[in-house]
């Protein structure tokens, strides 16, 4: 009986040399307003070349350089091989090869959509079959689309090369042995300092006694859960919280607050602390602060970080503060800048960099516990394995604190500052949370922008807009300036960044003098940026004007809010 196979199957086609960009990678697709779900993988700013170097093990600089431009990509690559595997192996998905454009970053470049079946079978996309636009600058992103509202999938993407190019043979990394002695030794290296343990031990004892305890996390995209899949279950904050519950909890007495916002530094973190950490009414007993890879964007180079730490330390319920230093794929973080704050206040500190970086460069059979490929989701964010390592590093600190004798409550108020934390009483001002000491004239900023950065807070299974109570000016609302008169010795202006061409610049004036121009296009994606309009002034009424820049008067501009000095209670 025939099984329906071909009578004369073709000989196999010889595979071209290839570069794996993504191998056995787990992604999470999020619900879109128009329906379905998507998972984008961003490849601009050298990230495509970095994938080829880190995962594909390409060392040829000429090949890596070709991957940085649209012209070079088409010269090097013959075809793109893609596979997607989901629990439901019969559904359809779409893969989008999205080139970024010169005239309009997101819209004027080539977009090639290919249908896939989610059974893990590879589909090869020849570049010769693509109708290329002339405006392409670089490979911007790979996007995976699904019909459902949420999906977790495992993907592979490789580049098959044109004749004349070669690439190293791809050898998959071994999985991490989380139960090995080598793993435990690696985690122990994350321990920087126990610091004064009295506040952390107080929270531990409360949890053991069945009293309510809240463990809170504030930081950037890593704290938000970027790279973990599914993020709300496997991000480091949730896993570390679970570890704390397992060690010390009694039933459901330990509570969780997560306030990570991608692409933001402690400059915004100190402003949103009351809303995002205290806003639900819980006063945290433990706060983990994670800005070690975000604070390059802090224009004060440490003032805002120390401000946030002091704001937490001096809270009336005296919470423990733990400083967590995460790391980028290039081994970089700001530990040397920020750890002196931990030393000055004798705080518990944990360094993921100290744990993992040295062993990255050991051979697989000579001490390496986890490779960069398995630790990093992209050049900025850890995978679920990486998030677990971060959580286990915090858990190691919890265990050390539990085992140590209790210290004496320190006199934090007697300590000198490391930087200049003048913003300790900073608060958020927006359309909703006003301030009696402020007089606002909206001018042409009469609309509310709803196209915002969305994040998953706490244990929410939905995304919340960041700073939704804003002021937006459009071409139709005119170009009258936004004016705020406020009694405060400093003022920070929070504005929206966007990669969309309809957003333009705005000029900021303080007491009639020009101070800065805010350019939403500088970063190239939708998120929030805080900038100091003025500081160190007399605590009297100052006038701040925000005017559309004359070059972009026909464009939109969004003011998300302000950070001002709240009168002390």
Which functions belong to the PLM regions below?
Residues 290-294, 304-340, 344:
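Active-site segments of SGNH/GDSL-like serine hydrolases
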Residues 187-193, 331-433:
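Catalytic His-Asp segment of secreted/periplasmic serine-dependent ester chemistry enzymes
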Residues 221-224, 261-266, 292-298, 319, ...:
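Solvent-exposed loop/turn segments at secondary-structure junctions
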Residues 214-218, 223, 255-260, 285-291, ...:
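Structural recognition of the beta-strand scaffold that forms the well-ordered cores
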Residues 216-217, 228, 266-302:
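Oxyanion-hole/transition-state-stabilizing segment in secreted/luminal serine hydrolases
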Residues 238-255:
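Signal peptide-proximal N-terminal region
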Residues 1-218, 223-230, 249-252, 388, ...:
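N-terminal secretory targeting modules
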Residues 195-204, 237-241, 266-280, 302-311, ...:
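Alpha-helical scaffolding within the catalytic cores
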């Amino acid at each position: 009986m025939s099984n329906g196979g071909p009578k004369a199957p073709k000989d196999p086609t010889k595979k071209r040399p290839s570069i794996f960009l993504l191998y056995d990678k787990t992604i999470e697709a999020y619900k879109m307003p128009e329906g379905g779900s998507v998972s984008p993988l961003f490849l601009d700013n050298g990230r495509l070349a970095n994938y080829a170097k880190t995962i594909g093990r390409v060392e040829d600089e000429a090949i890596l350089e070709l991957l940085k431009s649209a012209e070079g990509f088409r010269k090097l690559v013959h075809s793109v091989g893609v596979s997607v595997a989901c629990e439901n192996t019969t559904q359809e998905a779409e893969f989008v090869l999205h080139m970024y454009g010169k005239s309009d970053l997101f819209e004027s470049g080539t977009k090639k959509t290919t249908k896939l079946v989610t059974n893990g079978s590879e589909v090869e996309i020849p570049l010769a079959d693509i109708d290329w636009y002339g405006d392409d600058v670089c490979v911007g992103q790979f996007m995976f689309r699904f019909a459902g509202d949420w999906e977790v999938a495992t993907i592979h993407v490789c580049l098959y090369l044109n004749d004349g190019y070669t690439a190293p043979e791809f050898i998959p990394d071994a999985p991490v042995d989380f139960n090995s002695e080598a793993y435990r030794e690696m985690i122990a290296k994350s321990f920087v300092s126990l610091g004064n343990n009295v506040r952390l031990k107080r929270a531990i004892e409360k949890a053991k006694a069945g009293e309510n305890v809240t463990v809170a996390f504030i930081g950037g995209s890593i704290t938000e859960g970027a790279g973990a899949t599914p993020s709300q279950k496997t991000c480091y904050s949730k896993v570390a919280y679970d570890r704390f519950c397992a060690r010390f909890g009694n039933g459901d007495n330990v509570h969780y607050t997560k306030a990570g916002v991608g692409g933001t530094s402690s400059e915004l973190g100190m402003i949103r602390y009351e809303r995002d950490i205290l806003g639900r009414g819980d006063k945290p007993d433990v706060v983990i602060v994670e800005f070690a890879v975000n604070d390059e964007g802090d224009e004060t180079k440490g003032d805002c970080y120390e401000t946030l730490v002091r704001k937490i330390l001096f809270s009336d319920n005296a919470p423990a503060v733990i400083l967590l230093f995460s790391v980028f794929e290039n081994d970089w973080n700001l530990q040397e800048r920020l750890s002196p704050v931990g030393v000055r206040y004798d705080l518990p500190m944990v360094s993921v960099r100290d744990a993992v970086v040295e062993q990255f460069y050991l051979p697989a059979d000579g001490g390496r516990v986890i490779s960069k490929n398995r630790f990093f989701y992209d050049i900025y964010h850890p995978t679920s394995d990486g998030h677990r390592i971060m959580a286990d590093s915090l858990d190691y600190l919890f265990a050390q604190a539990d085992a140590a004798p209790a210290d004496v409550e320190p006199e934090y108020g007697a300590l000198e500052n490391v930087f200049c934390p003048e913003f300790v009483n900073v608060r958020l001002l927006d359309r909703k949370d006003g301030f009696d000491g402020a007089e606002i004239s909206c001018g042409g900023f009469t609309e509310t922008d709803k196209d915002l950065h969305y994040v998953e807070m706490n244990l929410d299974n939905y995304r919340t807009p960041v700073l939704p109570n804003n002021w937006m000016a459009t071409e139709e609302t005119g170009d009258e300036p936004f004016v705020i008169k406020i009694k405060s010795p400093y003022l920070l202006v929070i504005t929206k960044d966007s990669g969309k061409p309809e957003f333009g610049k705005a000029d900021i004036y303080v007491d009639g003098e020009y101070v800065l121009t805010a350019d939403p296009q500088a970063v190239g994606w939708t998120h929030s940026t805080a900038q100091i309009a003025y500081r160190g002034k007399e605590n009297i009424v100052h006038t701040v004007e925000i005017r559309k820049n004359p070059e972009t008067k026909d464009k939109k501009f969004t003011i998300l809010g302000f950070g001002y000095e709240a009168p002390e209670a």
